[in-house]
Regions:
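A short helix-loop-beta-strand connector motif used in the catalytic cores of GNAT acetyltransferases and
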Residues: 38-48, 55, 69
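Conserved acetyl-CoA-binding loop-helix of GNAT-fold acetyltransferases
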Residues: 75, 81-94, 116-120
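Conserved beta-strand-loop-alpha-helix junction that forms the acyl-donor binding cleft
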Residues: 77-80, 105-115, 131-138
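Conserved GNAT-fold acetyl-CoA-binding loop/helix
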Residues: 8, 14-41
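Conserved acetyl-CoA-binding loop of GNAT-fold acetyltransferases
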Residues: 119-129
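Conserved N-terminal entry element of GNAT/NAT acetyltransferase domains
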Residues: 1-8, 138-140
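Short hydrophobic/aromatic beta-strand element in the GNAT-like acyltransferase core
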Residues: 45-48, 58, 72, 105, ...
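Conserved beta-strand in the GNAT
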Residues: 54-62, 67-74
Length: 140
């Protein structure tokens, strides 16, 4: 279940994103930028994914120009493959739909295994900006 993250959760969430994205960043010649993460945190809607009383993931939504973007969706390594990312994604879509918005957008590395997850949940490719692709899910 998603719950609003507090300021004290920022370091934990940042470490999760940094660790989960380390291989992709290395592959694409990028460096982790803690200042960028802090700025994104400050400008976004931050949620923890909780299961069995503990934090097992992190999700951030960003609203820009009247649209909502899924900026981060991370699950701790030992809890992947259990449907937690799917649950978080469906809850994020419900949040955005509840605001009356018609779509949720995101960017993801084109070579990320997450692309399959997003496609299974109705996201289609809108643009290709290597190494990223932009995707959108229309919300009924």
């Amino acid at each position: 279940m998603l719950e609003v993250a507090s300021a004290r959760d920022r370091d934990w969430a940042g470490a999760l994103v940094r660790d989960n994205m380390a291989e992709a960043y290395r592959r694409h010649g990028l460096a982790w930028d803690p200042a960028r993460f802090a700025a994104d945190w400050a400008g976004g809607e931050n949620y923890l994914l909780r299961c069995d009383g503990g934090a097992v993931g992190y999700l951030r939504l960003l609203r820009h120009a009247g649209r909502s973007y899924l900026q981060d969706l991370q699950v701790v390594a030992e809890r992947r493959g259990l449907g937690l990312g799917t649950q978080a994604l469906e809850q994020a879509k419900a949040l955005v739909r509840g605001r009356g918005e018609a779509a949720l957008r995101l960017k993801v590395f084109a070579d990320s295994p997450a692309v399959r997850l997003y496609r299974r949940h109705g996201f289609v490719e809108l643009l290709n900006e290597p190494p990223l692709i932009g995707m959108e899910c229309r919300l009924p």
